């Protein structure tokens, strides 16, 4: 399993193989060819995470490998984009996206952290959830907003519980600016308020909880940068 952490597959103890970057490179190559089936198959096979049966998949050269790569939120968004290209931005597609995110969360995210608190989780972030809410707005999927926000409320609650537990460790930040991501996500919530899909009280409650989570993420990363020695990432040339 290749995660965003030190890996002993290299001779240099200060080097590591970034599994999420490798996964993203594979998926990006398929996405640029417009091969949505291969994009979804790459995510499902390489992360050991199931994709809803309603979407088209195919065999890929990686089908016989035993390697498991940790996904990033960018890879998750690539997979969801492939789903939307297959089905279209329709209200009926949103429940499938939500089911997919629940599977990812169980395998890698806050749900896994709940049952395996000692494992370092890969949390689904605000950028990914903002994409889903934006698609709800585009598809006029009023009835699907409540399940999406209920799922996000659970994500925030479980992540906050992990951050305040004895098992908490600095998490891998995937957004260059968590605060900017928080502002954009809140702007999307305010659009839901303007359409009267949610109340101002609900928007405020979600924002406050997300604010606490972002603070823990940023504070943990600052401590990690202050105490962690420098590690070399494999350059694109393949030499270290």
Residue ranges of model-derived segments:
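A basic, Ser/Thr-enriched alpha-helical scaffold prevalent
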Residues: 1-240
